[in-house]
């Protein structure tokens, strides 16, 4: 019977379970046979229902024995043991931490159906019964479905470890802990599978061996091992028993040696035997599953410290202080300690290895020093569980000896050299020395202490070669990730606040606190500070000079001057090497606060601080010079359009005399030290003295004291911008200080409304007033000669002499903003001279005075009967425009458009197209008509049409103009009211094919004959400005028909 039982038992032996420490010893301790021992141990191990009589050894035959896993009952214990070993082996063989005790199982939990359920006598071979309610089924799938009706049954079990679950997804998640795969296959190994596993529709029969777990589990840490040998080897880690205690005695005893005496002898002298082939290897290395580099599970357990209950527990502070820069110091550098501390640690290490103690998994086996840290105090003899507690305790002894020592702030971490015990000297110094060096680099030596220069020593005087970092606070023992945070924390104990606000008395221990204070309370002042900080990266000298010059604004300037003797107190050569950087940014940086009225105030404010008295003289002197010079240049650029009488001194108090004295001061400084003059000049050239925002320092506000203000001559209005003053004078005083500029603006407004004239073929040109204007009246001192003689002088100019009149115009037609400040004189003389000049240059013109509107019709019609058939007949326009003879058709047709686009100044004489004598006659008649009406206004009307004529038809180099040296009164007139020399103004009465048609009123007497084809003609009944505007618009409208008209 016994052989039959052993033959049917699972292949996995129960020796580990029977011989292990988890065996529950029975009261019967006499040696028995195997079957009796098995049965007795099974009786002891398999618990029964929680009743007192069940706890007593059952006597066969008196009461039935119930199985704890199912509802079957047995009369003999042997049968019960066989049943448990056969049917419930996975649950039985699991460790105590995973086994389910019988007391906690409900009756429904006992009904567990296996793959091969026992065939009872009352069940047929092809039927399956429910062990909970006894219902039978033909198919195992139906039994599994039926089992789900019993809610409390643990239907799903793990075939690896034996744990059972009520829900399938619990089992699925559990299976991932074993192999990382889904637990779907575990259903096949339950009792009464719903659908057996098939391969190509072939049902796979599961052997009984697959039910058992192929892994061994450690009862302490729960780690799995593939075989029993590896599990036993692993247990040595927990029990701290080496192989010498179990196997070495057995292996050494046959050799006849003295193993015990030899080991004692070696331990006495702290010697280690030569590596034994069996015992030389560490137990940890004998377990490949525990190698963190082999399995992830072992690494995870090793890093979390759950593999073994080590003698030395990893310190939480050291775990938290793993910094990228400091944490690897202990692992990267080997410790080479000397002295008694090293000897003691080596002795302890050898003792441990001689006994075969396995080191902690969390420590690197390559570093023997990781286990050398003592755990007892050598001064008072107290023992501690961890090294960290010993470190905290050692401070008690250090504080007792700190009476006459330095203050804790003299070192970053507060440690004093030579105050630790021999056992703690090496570790404490390791953790402290590098702290100083790294603290200086991380914290930037903010405390101003000579960090990193101390070398801690042991009591024996030996220097520590290996320096590691400790981030423990010497006052409260807290650990920190880096020395930066340790230094900040130490300030809470020492009360040090190195970060001081430069605007108030606030001081902070951290940079972030100061930054928050500045943003909350001094946000306005932060603009200048941010600009200075921005310049720090570009040039350190720039920052020094800016802070030196900004002495009166901030308190930070005082701190700077205390340590800036090398900047301002240096020789001139060194000063000027650093100062030009200020000159480039003097307008953009807040060198002088707005409160400084002049440079004298700057000296006075700078002298208020005693620290600034020595440094005051060199820098502000040159800044004073630069300020004056910049004021002069800015005033010259911004007020160039104003007259000398309107120039007012800047509000900063520097008068014209002071501005003139500045070159002398510059020469004085240059003579004092001429070595830096070239460097200053080279830095002055790219100075940006414009009023606009500076690009190099946009965040710096421009000091208003450096910008000269402009005062209105009519009131007390002041402004920094000429444009604002001009708008103020126009709106408030109805006056424009720049007459020529005003005329130019109006001309641009009227003449440029429609863009470039079509005759220019898209080539846009500026107004003629900005290029060609007649020369002053000095070119024609006396114009009272007879008209024929004047005509005889001016008519013959050929192609080479044509620039005479154009050259005369050039000076007056210069840009108006350059002539705006010139005083105008001799108004009447210029008017008369201009009228005579126009009469001589253009003999056929007839100028009608603008005020005498009643004479205009007469002057318009008088020249007509004089020579109606003459092609050179001249007549005056209603607005006083000068009319010129039109060319014949033969000379007009070939040039065509070239007359307007590509005319040269040499063709001015030939433009009239008629002989000179003929033109003289007509001019005499035309001028005789206009002579009686000569008055002051006549001088105005000539330039009225000067601009429009020049813009619309002629290029700048093609025009022949009268002298434009006119009194200032005409400047109030718009340039569009001034007509250019109207070379083509008058056409022949019969010349309908002229290049221009002009819209003339139908009721005008001369609209059909004389004025036909004439260039813009104004109306008699309209004012000058309105008529001129309409004339210009008519001309623009008819200009598109020029090429066609010339051909007809």
From Swiss-Prot:
Gene: ZNF217
Gene Ontology process terms (BP): negative regulation of DNA-templated transcription; negative regulation of transcription by RNA polymerase II; regulation of DNA-templated transcription
Zinc fingers typed C2H2-type, residue spans: 65-88, 128-150, 156-178, 216-238, 375-397, 471-493, 499-521
Subcellular location: Nucleus
Name used for this protein in its record: Zinc finger protein 217
Role of this protein: Binds to the promoters of target genes and functions as repressor. Promotes cell proliferation and antagonizes cell death. Promotes phosphorylation of AKT1 at 'Ser-473'.
Region (Disordered): 242-262, 315-375, 395-457, 644-670, 772-883
Keywords: DNA-binding, Isopeptide bond, Metal-binding, Nucleus, Phosphoprotein, Repeat, Repressor, Transcription, Transcription regulation, Ubl conjugation, Zinc, Zinc-finger
Amino acid composition bias (Basic and acidic residues), ranges on this chain: 346-356, 363-375, 852-861
Chain positions with Phosphothreonine modification: 322, 648
Source organism of this protein record: Homo sapiens (Human)
UniProt record similarity statement: Belongs to the krueppel C2H2-type zinc-finger protein family.
Domain of life, source organism: Eukaryota
Entry's Gene Ontology cellular component terms: histone deacetylase complex; mitochondrion; nuclear speck; nucleoplasm; nucleus
Source lineage: Eukaryota, Metazoa, Chordata, Craniata, Vertebrata
PTM sites of type Phosphoserine: 106, 321, 407, 593, 662, 795
UniProt-listed SUPFAM superfamilies: beta-beta-alpha zinc fingers
